[in-house]
Amino acid sequence: AVIFGGISREHELSLASATDVITNIPKDKYEVICIGITRKGRWLYYPGDVADIATGKWELNPDCTSAVISPDPLHRGIIILENGEVSIRKIDVVFPLLHGKSGADGTIQGLLDLSGIPYVGCGLLAAASCMDKSHTHMVMDDFGIKTAEWRLITQRELSEIDECCEKIAGELGFPLIVKPANSGSDAGTSYADSPESL
């Protein structure tokens, strides 16, 4: 199964990833079950064309129907709710192609672990740890793994943002890459080459 979409602001990136993966899975060897998650968090079984995933039109398909992951390891699969009837589609493995919140933060990995469904990618702890960039840097530092110089500005420090920016510019110099600690991909990332742009 391929799970795509999601509630994060990286929804479109997830659709692009899913399109690439689905397109490259050999259909003569594997049956691909597509589960899309709308921006509002609705889970839908999607039996339509992969091209509509790329454009975001997939959720308008009248053949979409509500779906959830079975939490019971004895009934491993996707529960599809259609016309008042429930069916389970057994699955062998999941490609969780969600990005950002509820996808790359360990949430989907935890759900799949609970359900006993194997999946591609890192596990819950690694995903959760790596979603928070400051936490990742601290872990790497503890293990003596070199990373780029970095500084964290906390919510409390935002009231003194000018002083924080001045201190960071003095310690690190320019140019700087500014990134939210808890966003995936390049969401919210900016380039600062001066105190004003920082």
Predicted regions and their residues:
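Hydrophobic, aliphatic-enriched repeat segments that assemble into extended interaction scaffolds
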Residues: 1-3, 30-33
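Residues at helix C-cap/C′ positions in short coil/turn segments immediately following an alpha-helix
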Residues: 28-29, 172
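Intrinsically disordered, low-complexity regions enriched in small/polar residues
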Residues: 6, 32, 47-48, 121, ...
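Active-site nucleotide/adenylate-binding loops and adjacent lid/helix of ATP-dependent enzymes
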Residues: 1-3, 8-9, 16-19, 84-88, ...
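Conserved N-proximal alpha/beta basic substrate-recognition cap immediately N-terminal to
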Residues: 15-19, 27, 33-155
